[in-house]
């Protein structure tokens, strides 16, 4: 089995004016495609790992051959992270129900959660991701470097938990529209969060 670039469930301009068409198209067809290609190349002679869903593969990086660990950490990680990211974007959804109640329980309020998430995203030095994760029965905000995922575990990524929501803070995700204004990009994210997808991920793991 080889990995393939997932189709987006919306047009490249569907998130305008918050996320621009040109960035979405380049991000998906160039950056994400490169992670897919590189992951497949690294897995060519590793059928026991190539057969795994990418979300499972990145939980088993300590089992892959040492000379493939870094390339798969970066590129299988990039494929997994972006696949989640695209599904987590949609205009017009509302935070409600069990996920909203859990956020209010664990952060005190939705505004407190957003402030903590924005801080994690804005202060991640260089490239990386901010995440809302479920750890056991508690929600938490974490961030990871590069294409690391909380699914990789603390020993590799410095974070753990099941991702409910993720935001890409690599410059390629926002530079064409926002240049160096990462905080502005982060603020716009709230206008395109697919809360239905986040709620479904939460319900599947709670």
Curated annotation (Swiss-Prot):
PROSITE patterns: SOD_MN (PS00088)
Keyword Manganese: yes
EC number of the protein: 1.15.1.1
Catalytic activity reported: 2 superoxide + 2 H(+) = H2O2 + O2
GO cellular component entries: cytoplasm
InterPro entries: Mn/Fe_SOD, Mn/Fe_SOD_BS, Mn/Fe_SOD_C, Mn/Fe_SOD_N, Mn/Fe_SOD_N_sf, SOD_C_sf
Entry-linked PANTHER family: 37S RIBOSOMAL PROTEIN S26, MITOCHONDRIAL (PTHR43595), SMALL RIBOSOMAL SUBUNIT PROTEIN MS42 (PTHR43595:SF2)
Family: Belongs to the iron/manganese superoxide dismutase family.
Name by which UniProt lists this protein: Superoxide dismutase [Mn]
Organism, scientific name: Salmonella typhimurium (strain LT2 / SGSC1412 / ATCC 700720)
